Amino acid sequence: MSGSYDDRDGKIWMNGKLIEWRDANVHILTHAMHYASSVFEGERAYNGKIFKSVLHSQRLLKSAKMVDFEIPYSVDEIEKAKYDALRANKLEDAYVRAVAWRGAGEDMGVASLRNPVNLAVATWSWGNYYGDAKMKGAKLDVAKWQRPDPKTAPFEAKACLLYTSDAADEWIG
């Protein structure tokens, strides 16, 4: 699979159903788009088995609770969704991305607790992330941005809102 991530063949598991990859869309007024109310897991599958999958599913649920939303699926249901997506895309060795987010609803305030919570799982073939550097060694950068104080955000959560400070150095230069 190559090309733009929004224009691929395959299936994505979204809110209980396998849908066409290109149909996996969310509205521009989705709460997560404005307030980063989303959590995710990035996992690898080898020979059809997702590495430490249950632990990742447990952390996904825990991360969501830390940022004040509850994913409407159990660990077992998330596990089934991940493996359904792998099989639907006929993948054995793959990257598995589970993402949950507060969606568009009646509210657009910071909390928006009444808005629905969504879950999607995408799987795709993704080779060695580090390419040749895996054997040669990788160049590392240290962001000039300091992570927020642990009292300002739930730093244990694998939440989108906590990743931007690390990436901002790349964006800003």
Task: Indicate residue ranges for each PLM-predicted region.
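Conserved alpha/beta cores of soluble small-molecule-handling proteins
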Residues: M1-S165
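Single conserved hydrophobic/aromatic residue that forms the stacking wall/gate
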Residues: Y163, A167-G173
